[in-house]
Amino acid sequence: MLIAVEGIDGAGKTTIAAYIAELLKEKGYKVKVLKEPGDSKFGKKIKSSEERLSPEEELELFLKDREIDARENILPALQSGYAVVMDRYYFSNIAYQSARGIDARLIREMNEKIAPKPDLTILLDVEPEIALERVRKRGKLSPFEKLDYLRKVRKCFLENADETTVVVDASKPLEEVKEEVRKVIESFLNLKKNSN
């Protein structure tokens, strides 16, 4: 089982990914939480660059990093019976790079050639103004965190949501967001159980 947690910077992905892992463990699943970009040399280059790279360079680095992550972490965990929760996955790639002009369908196709499709994607949707305020409280803003750009990214996330995606309003207080996510996970697990 592969669950992706997506959203713009400051949406609460890391907190909610950890919460989903707790919920799944309570239900008896072995769980791994993985974060992207990963720790490959390509992921490190994305994280360490002070300035934005060109959209094409960014896409290439994300794809190379994800290919390694899929081969070395995601697929082996799934094959060993783990439920994998992704703190960011390729929908981030689709949203962030299509907001800079690359065709969203092309990005999706390139990603789906190298990485497994999630069974469920939880899109934490939040107004960019709220998200940026949360990020500011954490410390330094990255080059990815500019208001106009995040508005475009949010729009791209919503426009490119697919049949695996459930949109959750992440502007609410954390306990309310968690409660909504818990309902989504329970409904997903029930559907999964009934389809087996």
Swiss-Prot record:
ATP binds at residues 7-14. GO terms for molecular function: ATP binding; dTMP kinase activity. Coiled coil: none annotated. Its EC number is 2.7.4.9. InterPro entries: P-loop_NTPase, Thymidylate_kin-like_dom, Thymidylate_kin_CS, Thymidylate_kinase. One of its GO terms (biological process) is dTDP biosynthetic process. GO terms for cellular component: cytoplasm. It catalyses: dTMP + ATP = dTDP + ADP. Pfam families: Thymidylate_kin. PROSITE patterns: THYMIDYLATE_KINASE. Keywords: ATP-binding, Kinase, Nucleotide biosynthesis, Nucleotide-binding, Transferase. Belongs to the thymidylate kinase family. HAMAP family: Thymidylate_kinase. This is Probable thymidylate kinase. It comes from Archaeoglobus fulgidus (strain ATCC 49558 / DSM 4304 / JCM 9628 / NBRC 100126 / VC-16).
